[in-house]
Swiss-Prot record:
UniProt-recorded name of the protein: Receptor expression-enhancing protein 4
Origin organism lineage: Eukaryota, Metazoa, Chordata, Craniata, Vertebrata
Gene Ontology biological process terms from the UniProt entry: cell division; endoplasmic reticulum tubular network organization; mitotic nuclear membrane reassembly; nuclear envelope organization
Organism this protein belongs to: Bos taurus
Residue numbers carrying Phosphoserine: S152, S194, S202, S253
Topology with respect to the bilayer: Multi-pass membrane protein
């Protein structure tokens, strides 16, 4: 564990940070010799990192594996050994120049295929999204149509006519029992008030009321005075008729006597 931590620290500092700063100095000073040197180093170091990914999985159990890796990185970087330049000139450059055309064709094919695959995946994704949207819309329309169909008149007619449910408190059941009023004309003993009535009126039946008379026009001031003046005459006539009737009734009584 300690050797692994030390190895990672050495690779980070001496394999990446210091060469990056040296490359910056070479670009700034426009020193072609240093520029070529650090370019060869970065090519070799990139291949080393690619190989390290697999060796850490399969050969990490080998004794002194991390120590050998640290020594190799220092050997590549050292200005005395110049291991990166030597590996590049003897192995990397000849192999790359030998398979350069094949590598270029593979890169071009990979670009074209990647472009085609991206387009195909994009089309498939759009088709899947469109189909999902259509299915969701059809489902929502079906649900809405079902709800509207449930509110049709045919379904409403099939609903049984019954009393509306009422809430009953279990603690006060006696107080909540509705007491029906007895019908009008019904006595406690089961007899009716009048024998002529064939039916008993209940509290739910409404007695028909006479139609309202049309509202008469208000009398004028002169008409009201005439009516007031005529009233005493009507009373005198009635009193005279009463006197005549009483006299006629008393006359036969005198004759009998």
């Amino acid at each position: 564990m300690v050797s692994w931590m030390i190895c990672r620290l050495v690779v980070l500092v001496f394999g990446m940070l210091y060469p990056a700063y040296a490359s910056y100095k070479a670009v700034k000073t426009k020193n072609i010799r240093e520029y070529v040197r650090w370019m060869m180093y970065w090519i070799v170091f990139a291949l080393f990192m690619a190989v390290e990914t697999f060796t850490d999985i399969f050969i990490s159990w080998f004794p002194f594996y991390y120590e050998i890796k640290m020594a190799f990185v220092l050997w590549l970087l050292s200005p005395y050994t110049r291991g990166a330049s030597m590996l590049y000139r003897k192995f990397v450059h000849p192999s790359l120049s030998r398979h350069e055309k094949e590598i270029d064709t593979y890169i071009v094919q990979a670009k074209e295929r990647s472009y085609e695959t991206v387009l195909s995946f994009g089309k498939r994704g759009l088709n899947i999204a469109a189909s999902a949207a259509v299915q969701a819309a059809t489902k929502s329309q079906g649900a809405l149509a079902g709800k509207l169909r449930s509110f049709s008149m045919q379904d409403l007619r099939t609903i049984p006519d019954g009393p509306a449910p009422t809430y009953q408190d279990p603690l006060y059941l006696e107080d909540q029992v509705p007491h029906r009023r007895p019908p009008i004309g019904y006595r406690a003993g089961g007899l009716r008030d009048s024998d002529t009535d064939n039916e008993c009126w209940s509290d739910t039946e409404v007695v028909p009321q006479p139609p309202a008379r049309p509202r008469e026009k208000p009398l004028g001031r002169s008409q009201s005075l005439r009516v007031i003046k005529r009233k005493p005459l009507a009373r005198e006539g009635t009193s005279r008729s009463l006197k005549v009737r009483t006299r006629k009734k008393t006359a036969p009584s005198d004759m009998d006597s």
